[in-house]
């Protein structure tokens, strides 16, 4: 089992939690981005830099992910693709995407895209809070404990 990170948009505080978890559990952690990402020296952590472009990092994750792997992403279409391949998906706020909820999340995302395209200001996600960080850490720990 490996952890894949959609690293371009992943908050730094979440990456730090992931670095520590990878070391603690000796789990391979791969950060995929189309720009340079700093990672600690570790036998468990590596980065993959892909060419710039829309969805290039996402496509690399989908290409490489295996059933049972965990993908960290806030990108709902990416989450849907990796779930379809038998992997797991967790967003940086600690919400697990599953076969039970991913269709509803995709529908809501598409609806919000339609609203934005028609000129409606839908706002954005609130800033990452301590509660979000804790929710992520807790869900990551639950996943790693259950999947060792």
From Swiss-Prot:
Signal peptide: none annotated. It comes from the Bacteria. It holds the Pfam family DUF188. Belongs to the UPF0178 family. This is UPF0178 protein Mlg_1612. It comes from Alkalilimnicola ehrlichii (strain ATCC BAA-1101 / DSM 17681 / MLHE-1).
């Amino acid at each position: 089992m490996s952890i894949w990170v959609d690293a371009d948009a992943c908050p730094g505080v979440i990456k730090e939690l992931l670095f520590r978890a990878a070391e603690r559990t000796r789990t391979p952690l791969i950060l995929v981005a189309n720009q340079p990402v700093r990672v600690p020296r570790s036998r468990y952590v590596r980065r993959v830099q892909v060419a710039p472009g829309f969805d290039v990092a996402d496509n690399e994750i989908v290409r490489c992910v295996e059933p049972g792997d965990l993908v960290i992403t806030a990108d709902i279409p990416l989450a849907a693709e990796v779930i379809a391949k038998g992997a797991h998906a967790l967003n940086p706020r600690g919400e697990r995407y599953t076969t039970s909820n991913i269709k509803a999340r995709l529908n809501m995302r598409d609806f919000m895209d339609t609203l934005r395209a028609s000129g409606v200001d839908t706002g954005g996600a609130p800033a990452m809070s301590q509660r979000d960080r804790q929710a992520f850490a807790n869900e990551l720990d639950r996943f790693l404990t259950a999947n060792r």
